[in-house]
Structures are given as structure tokens and as C-alpha cells.
Amino acid sequence: MNSIEFTLLARRTQNSVISTTSNDLSNWSRLSSLWPLLYGTSCCFIEFASLIGSRFDFDRYGLVPRSSPRQADLILTAGTVTMKMAPSLVRLYEQMPEPKYVIAMGACTITGGMFSTDSYSTVRGVDKLIPVDVYLPGCPPKPEAIIDAITKLRKKISREIYEDRIRSQEENRCFTTNHKFHVGPSMHTGNYDPGLLYQLPSTSEIASETFFKYKSSVSAHELVN
């Protein structure tokens, strides 16, 4: 409709009123005030610390780091996650209020990185523990890449429906932390054999809660998950 047909008062009223939905208003307020819980365990977190300076100035995105998970709606995992850390990470995630989001930063967080081939204590991807919204690969990712990941998360928040988000998180709370260990042949024989890296275990599984109980009895073997 042509604005000339309206009177001056009507045009002023039209320009001063914003029509929207409660869902869009909620999304706008949440994407403009993301409060992250920083879970840095390795060198990737040093790159995130660069964002605090004036060069990148992450305050312009409304990011306010919090020390308590009950005050955060975003957890940013950066670095290697071991099985000993897994229960603590899941507990922190569960203490965050809904809706909540996760950014997995760095190769070690996403796949286990260089520790994924021969380490028995490294989690092969944090998405085995908690649902991840944005994956940020790199070793380590640059600060510009972190800003891009935050921008993608903001776009995701702006398009989502609040009821669907709550329903999805109730159905997919988190993944199990009961890792299973397999007893395999020792690789420390002095001879390099790449086939051992991909050899399937032929013995029975050892549950994680009994690992330390039987650690001395399987010290001559390698444990791989």
C-alpha cells in the first residue's frame, strides 16, 4: 500500500510499531546475549583467549563468559577430552538451563585429534557425550574462525522454533559415558605394524567401571576404545 494515502499521524504510528511474534523476539534476545561457559583443556583455548582483546572484541556479540554453568547458555569445549573428564563435562552440560548450545572447537575435541589412534583415555569426539550444534575444525582454529562459528550459531538460533528445540533436547539429552574397553595385543613390540592400528579386538569387553580394578592384570596389553 502506498504511504501517500496515510496521514502524517498514521505514518508516524506505522513507523513506530514493530510487529513480531514471541518466538522471534525470544530468538533475537538469545542470539544477542550468548553467555558462554569456557571449557578449555588444551592449546585451542589460547586462540579463544585472543578474542578478549580489542582486535577482535567479542563483546560486540553479547558474549559474557560465566564461571557457573547455571548462568550460561553456551558451552565451548576446546582441547582434548579424556574419559576421566567425561562425567564432569556431562554434569556441567546438564546444569545449564534450557535452551543451551555447544560449540566443539578444535580437532582434538571433534575427533580426538592426534591422540585418537593409540590413546586409551581419549574420547573420540565430544559428541559422544553431549549434542554439538557447531563443529569448528582446526589445530588450532584461528580467532576469525571462532567468530564465524559464533555467527553460524546466531543464525541457527534466529531460525529455530523454541518448542521444537525443547522437545528435541528432551529426546536427546546426552550420550552415555559408560565407555567400553577392548583388550588388544600390545603394539610396543619394537616393530612397526600398521595393521595393529585397525585390528579388531577378539577378546571380551571390559566395562569402564572395572578398568582400574583390573588395570594391573592387563598392564601388558593395550586398551583401545
Swiss-Prot record:
Its EC number is 7.1.1.-. Gene3D superfamilies: 3.40.50.12280. One of its GO terms (molecular function) is 4 iron, 4 sulfur cluster binding. Keywords: 4Fe-4S, Chloroplast, Iron, Iron-sulfur, Membrane, Metal-binding, NAD, NADP, Plastid, Plastoquinone, Quinone, Thylakoid, Translocase, Transport. One of its GO terms (cellular component) is respiratory chain complex I. It comes from the Eukaryota. It holds the Pfam family Oxidored_q6. It is a peripheral membrane protein. Its main location: plastid. It is an enzyme of class 7 (translocase). [4Fe-4S] cluster binds at residues 43-44, 108, 139. NDH is composed of at least 16 different subunits, 5 of which are encoded in the nucleus. This is NAD(P)H-quinone oxidoreductase subunit K, chloroplastic. It comes from Oenothera argillicola. The gene is ndhK.
